[in-house]
């Protein structure tokens, strides 16, 4: 009985801090955008607006969940629930001091779950029975699938550099030197691709207000809309945490778990702030430019980098030992 309770409580204790971080990320985003546009941002609810995310959450969840009469009711409700479930599950194998799951193929697990998120977007757009929602969903799916190719190839390069699929191997590899130093072109492409993968500005074509109102979640209101929003921001935090681990900024304090956690929090926060900075600074890309960027620029470069990382160790096999 105690084991069952532990298996229920552990994931809950893991998810609550993530959801709290997501809530306050929305507040930080509004504050950052406010100050960059020479205004205050939220500053009424609580001291300097600190309780604003809680007020927003309560407001959304007590609203009546309006569903279009012509929509596919079951799929309409499953899509946001599945989106949040996937966004939470993807955090499980992270190499925290006391992680929830230690997977041998942790990187492939992340890649597989991030690919599954496409189905929630497609399901929500199709089940809404709205032209705008469907067009937004198709755009999002095409964009996500396109950039996943680049992300997969960059991950392959990192795996070959580190020599393993586990997060612990990647962390140990970076004890002496961050991988951003030998792999800075991949770091730049990874960061831009994560912006596109999470549908953030300047790649937020899925919610182009001028043509699509709000994109794939146009028919959602109240609780289901809040679930989509939580999933989106959880994925942003996840991608930045992954950038910290794999991309190139990881470091291992295996004997000092507190330092590991603090290091992860600080670096992920800085990378998330850059996401917000990019949103405040850049206009939205045109859709054809978005696709040209990945298929005509990023894909050839990442393929060349992959071939380089495969061929270099093979070509060095004949050299005598340097030790």
From Swiss-Prot:
Record EC number: 7.1.1.2
Keywords: Electron transport, Membrane, Mitochondrion, Mitochondrion inner membrane, NAD, Respiratory chain, Translocase, Transmembrane, Transmembrane helix, Transport, Ubiquinone
Membrane topology: Multi-pass membrane protein
Catalytic activity, reaction form: a ubiquinone + NADH + 5 H(+)(in) = a ubiquinol + NAD(+) + 4 H(+)(out)
Natural source organism: Xenopus laevis
Protein name as annotated: NADH-ubiquinone oxidoreductase chain 1
Cleaved signal peptide residues: none
Broad class of where this protein is predominantly found: mitochondrion
GO cellular component: mitochondrial inner membrane; respiratory chain complex I
